[in-house]
Amino acid sequence: MPRPFFLFAPGAGAPSTHPWMQKWKGYLESIGEVALFDYDYMREGGKRPDPPPQLVAAHRSALAEIRKKSSGPIFLIGKSMGGRIGCHVALQEEVAGLICLGYPLCGGGDRTKLRDKVLRELQTPILFIQGTRDPLCPPDLLEEVRSQMKAPNSLHPVEDGDHSLRLTKRGLQAAGETQDDVDQRILAAINEFVGLTAFL
Protein backbone atom coordinates (compact mmCIF):
# COMPACT_ATOMS: atom_id res chain seq x y z
CA MET A 1 0.00 0.00 0.00
CA PRO A 2 1.54 3.35 -1.02
CA ARG A 3 2.38 5.78 1.75
CA PRO A 4 0.46 9.04 2.00
CA PHE A 5 2.13 12.15 0.62
CA PHE A 6 1.95 15.53 2.35
CA LEU A 7 2.33 18.72 0.33
CA PHE A 8 3.27 21.15 3.10
CA ALA A 9 2.59 24.85 2.49
CA PRO A 10 4.09 27.65 4.62
CA GLY A 11 2.34 30.55 6.31
CA ALA A 12 2.59 34.11 5.05
CA GLY A 13 5.55 35.21 7.16
CA ALA A 14 7.91 32.25 7.24
CA PRO A 15 9.25 30.19 4.31
CA SER A 16 9.74 26.44 4.16
CA THR A 17 13.24 26.78 5.64
CA HIS A 18 11.87 28.19 8.92
CA PRO A 19 12.65 25.98 11.96
CA TRP A 20 8.92 25.51 12.70
CA MET A 21 8.31 24.17 9.19
CA GLN A 22 11.37 21.94 9.36
CA LYS A 23 10.29 20.56 12.74
CA TRP A 24 6.88 19.61 11.43
CA LYS A 25 8.33 18.17 8.24
CA GLY A 26 10.34 15.81 10.45
CA TYR A 27 7.25 14.85 12.44
CA LEU A 28 5.16 14.22 9.31
CA GLU A 29 7.84 11.99 7.81
CA SER A 30 6.93 9.41 10.46
CA ILE A 31 3.55 9.07 8.69
CA GLY A 32 4.33 9.59 5.00
CA GLU A 33 6.38 11.36 2.37
CA VAL A 34 6.64 15.15 2.70
CA ALA A 35 7.37 17.88 0.18
CA LEU A 36 7.77 21.53 1.12
CA PHE A 37 7.46 24.45 -1.27
CA ASP A 38 7.44 28.25 -1.19
CA TYR A 39 5.11 30.71 -2.88
CA ASP A 40 6.54 32.96 -5.60
CA TYR A 41 6.95 36.08 -3.44
CA MET A 42 8.93 34.11 -0.85
CA ARG A 43 11.34 32.76 -3.45
CA GLU A 44 11.80 36.30 -4.77
CA GLY A 45 12.52 37.73 -1.31
CA GLY A 46 9.26 39.65 -1.00
CA LYS A 47 7.42 40.29 2.25
CA ARG A 48 3.91 40.86 0.93
CA PRO A 49 1.94 37.80 -0.23
CA ASP A 50 1.03 37.51 -3.89
CA PRO A 51 -2.61 38.04 -4.93
CA PRO A 52 -4.75 34.96 -4.10
CA PRO A 53 -4.99 33.69 -7.71
CA GLN A 54 -1.17 33.66 -7.93
CA LEU A 55 -0.90 31.85 -4.57
CA VAL A 56 -3.39 29.23 -5.75
CA ALA A 57 -1.53 28.81 -9.06
CA ALA A 58 1.80 28.25 -7.26
CA HIS A 59 0.15 25.74 -4.92
CA ARG A 60 -1.41 23.85 -7.84
CA SER A 61 1.94 23.82 -9.64
CA ALA A 62 3.59 22.24 -6.59
CA LEU A 63 0.75 19.70 -6.43
CA ALA A 64 1.25 18.80 -10.10
CA GLU A 65 4.89 17.98 -9.35
CA ILE A 66 3.83 15.73 -6.46
CA ARG A 67 1.38 13.85 -8.67
CA LYS A 68 4.32 12.87 -10.90
CA LYS A 69 6.11 11.29 -7.91
CA SER A 70 3.36 9.72 -5.84
CA SER A 71 0.77 7.05 -6.48
CA GLY A 72 -0.46 7.28 -2.89
CA PRO A 73 -3.10 9.55 -1.36
CA ILE A 74 -2.10 13.22 -1.31
CA PHE A 75 -2.90 15.51 1.61
CA LEU A 76 -2.58 19.28 1.48
CA ILE A 77 -1.29 20.49 4.84
CA GLY A 78 -0.54 24.11 5.57
CA LYS A 79 0.45 26.57 8.23
CA SER A 80 -2.04 29.44 8.46
CA MET A 81 -2.22 31.01 4.97
CA GLY A 82 -0.85 27.81 3.44
CA GLY A 83 -3.81 25.90 4.85
CA ARG A 84 -6.28 28.49 3.58
CA ILE A 85 -4.82 28.46 0.07
CA GLY A 86 -4.85 24.66 0.19
CA CYS A 87 -8.61 24.84 0.74
CA HIS A 88 -8.97 26.93 -2.43
CA VAL A 89 -6.83 24.42 -4.33
CA ALA A 90 -9.08 21.58 -3.14
CA LEU A 91 -12.04 23.26 -4.86
CA GLN A 92 -10.22 22.70 -8.16
CA GLU A 93 -8.12 19.59 -7.53
CA GLU A 94 -8.98 16.19 -6.10
CA VAL A 95 -6.94 15.36 -3.00
CA ALA A 96 -7.46 12.89 -0.16
CA GLY A 97 -7.75 15.50 2.56
CA LEU A 98 -6.83 18.87 4.01
CA ILE A 99 -5.01 19.61 7.26
CA CYS A 100 -4.93 23.18 8.53
CA LEU A 101 -2.37 24.06 11.20
CA GLY A 102 -3.92 27.25 12.56
CA TYR A 103 -6.57 28.28 10.03
CA PRO A 104 -6.69 32.11 9.72
CA LEU A 105 -10.47 32.42 9.91
CA CYS A 106 -10.51 36.12 10.87
CA GLY A 107 -8.64 38.43 8.52
CA GLY A 108 -6.20 40.38 10.67
CA GLY A 109 -7.94 39.04 13.76
CA ASP A 110 -11.13 40.98 12.89
CA ARG A 111 -14.20 38.88 13.75
CA THR A 112 -16.21 40.72 11.08
CA LYS A 113 -13.82 39.68 8.29
CA LEU A 114 -14.38 35.94 8.10
CA ARG A 115 -12.55 33.80 5.56
CA ASP A 116 -15.25 31.16 5.67
CA LYS A 117 -16.68 31.09 2.13
CA VAL A 118 -14.15 28.54 0.90
CA LEU A 119 -14.81 26.32 3.93
CA ARG A 120 -18.54 26.29 3.20
CA GLU A 121 -17.87 25.30 -0.42
CA LEU A 122 -15.49 22.43 0.35
CA GLN A 123 -16.33 18.77 -0.24
CA THR A 124 -12.89 17.44 0.76
CA PRO A 125 -12.42 16.01 4.29
CA ILE A 126 -10.59 18.51 6.49
CA LEU A 127 -8.87 18.46 9.88
CA PHE A 128 -8.41 21.70 11.80
CA ILE A 129 -5.55 21.81 14.32
CA GLN A 130 -6.36 24.91 16.31
CA GLY A 131 -4.89 26.68 19.33
CA THR A 132 -7.57 27.91 21.71
CA ARG A 133 -5.67 31.21 22.20
CA ASP A 134 -5.39 31.91 18.47
CA PRO A 135 -6.78 35.42 17.82
CA LEU A 136 -7.11 34.61 14.12
CA CYS A 137 -9.53 31.76 14.81
CA PRO A 138 -11.72 32.11 17.91
CA PRO A 139 -13.09 28.67 18.88
CA ASP A 140 -16.72 29.83 18.92
CA LEU A 141 -16.54 31.19 15.38
CA LEU A 142 -14.83 28.07 14.05
CA GLU A 143 -17.47 25.85 15.66
CA GLU A 144 -20.22 27.92 14.04
CA VAL A 145 -18.61 27.59 10.60
CA ARG A 146 -17.88 23.88 11.06
CA SER A 147 -21.53 23.20 11.89
CA GLN A 148 -22.50 24.69 8.51
CA MET A 149 -19.86 22.97 6.36
CA LYS A 150 -20.74 20.29 3.80
CA ALA A 151 -17.33 18.65 3.95
CA PRO A 152 -16.53 16.02 6.60
CA ASN A 153 -14.60 18.02 9.16
CA SER A 154 -12.94 17.45 12.50
CA LEU A 155 -11.07 19.52 15.05
CA HIS A 156 -8.08 18.84 17.28
CA PRO A 157 -8.05 21.72 19.78
CA VAL A 158 -4.72 22.65 21.35
CA GLU A 159 -5.63 23.98 24.78
CA ASP A 160 -3.74 27.23 25.54
CA GLY A 161 -2.14 27.03 22.08
CA ASP A 162 -1.41 30.16 20.02
CA HIS A 163 -1.54 30.61 16.22
CA SER A 164 1.59 28.44 15.92
CA LEU A 165 0.14 25.81 18.31
CA ARG A 166 2.62 26.76 21.03
CA LEU A 167 1.64 26.79 24.70
CA THR A 168 2.78 29.36 27.21
CA LYS A 169 5.40 28.32 29.75
CA ARG A 170 2.75 28.70 32.43
CA GLY A 171 0.36 26.49 30.48
CA LEU A 172 2.98 23.80 30.03
CA GLN A 173 3.91 23.91 33.70
CA ALA A 174 0.27 23.71 34.77
CA ALA A 175 -0.28 20.68 32.55
CA GLY A 176 3.02 19.09 33.54
CA GLU A 177 3.95 18.77 29.87
CA THR A 178 6.52 19.85 27.32
CA GLN A 179 5.80 21.36 23.91
CA ASP A 180 6.98 18.08 22.41
CA ASP A 181 4.20 16.26 24.30
CA VAL A 182 1.68 18.66 22.77
CA ASP A 183 3.18 18.23 19.30
CA GLN A 184 3.06 14.44 19.56
CA ARG A 185 -0.68 14.56 20.33
CA ILE A 186 -1.18 16.76 17.28
CA LEU A 187 0.79 14.26 15.21
CA ALA A 188 -1.37 11.42 16.54
CA ALA A 189 -4.51 13.33 15.49
CA ILE A 190 -3.06 13.83 12.00
CA ASN A 191 -2.14 10.14 11.78
CA GLU A 192 -5.68 9.14 12.77
CA PHE A 193 -7.23 11.53 10.23
CA VAL A 194 -4.98 10.20 7.47
CA GLY A 195 -5.85 6.62 8.39
CA LEU A 196 -9.57 7.36 8.21
CA THR A 197 -9.51 9.32 4.95
CA ALA A 198 -6.53 8.15 2.87
CA PHE A 199 -8.36 5.54 0.84
CA LEU A 200 -11.96 6.76 0.89
Where are these regions (language model features)?
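Gly/Ala-rich beta-loop-alpha elbow adjacent to hydrolase catalytic centers
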Residues: 78-82, 86
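Conserved alpha/beta-hydrolase "acid-adjacent" motif
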Residues: 17, 135-141
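Short beta-strand/loop motif that positions the catalytic acidic residue
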Residues: 121-123, 128-130, 134
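The conserved beta1-alpha1 loop
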Residues: 7-11, 102, 130
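Serine-hydrolase catalytic machinery in alpha/beta-hydrolase-like enzymes
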Residues: 2-74, 85, 165-175
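A conserved short beta-strand
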Residues: 94-109
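C-terminal catalytic histidine-bearing segment of alpha/beta-hydrolase fold enzymes
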Residues: 153-200
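Short beta-strand immediately N-terminal to the catalytic nucleophile in serine-hydrolase-like folds
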Residues: 73-78, 101
